[in-house]
Amino acid sequence: MSRVVIKCGGRVVRGSAAAILTLADAGHEVCVVHGAGPQISEEMERFGIPVEFVGGRRVTTAAGLAVVRSSFAAVNRALCAELGPRAVGLLGDEIGLHALQLPELGLVGEPLPSRPKAVLEALDSGLIPVVAPLGVGPLNVNADEAAAALAVGLEAERLLFVTDVAGVFRDGVVLSSIEAGEADRLLDDGTFEGGIVPKLRAAIAAARNGVRAEIGETAVVA
């Protein structure tokens, strides 16, 4: 069976367990990467920490990173509890998810293709690694980018983005597929904006490295 990386956004984490377990029960090796965007923003606002994004990445100070880490840990525990005894919770910075720091954004990193031993051992044991997207440093890492980096590093066959939208929309219609070059062009001219942007960029990177990437119902092909 194939190796699959599933990225679950913070808004849909609690509703993702059934889809994850269905793939695992079918014999696929499943690695999960989760976000926690809404939870992090809520906590940052509670502590009076400014919430700012640049190109889909969260500007992160030392105080912000503490909130990011605690929020990721809480979401990770909740998702593992929902998945049951096969789930193994992992924090990316503790297992060797490497990233290049982007100093202009603070304690933020651009993840590099990684093949963490802890993830491989979990998969080999028939378990489901559930990874919080922190990079070695520690650095805050965009969850979409982290999922793509792991998919490439783990040589996964598929990268699935589970979101609260049906897929990539253009002119009000969900696309069944989009070619990476066309997606690049539309991103550059501003056709796409908001949360779909980092997902598309991550899917493009994965597709160009041999991974079949899907955002909801939309396949992104190299």
Model-identified regions with their sequence ranges:
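C-terminal catalytic "cap/lid" subdomain
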Residues: 1-222
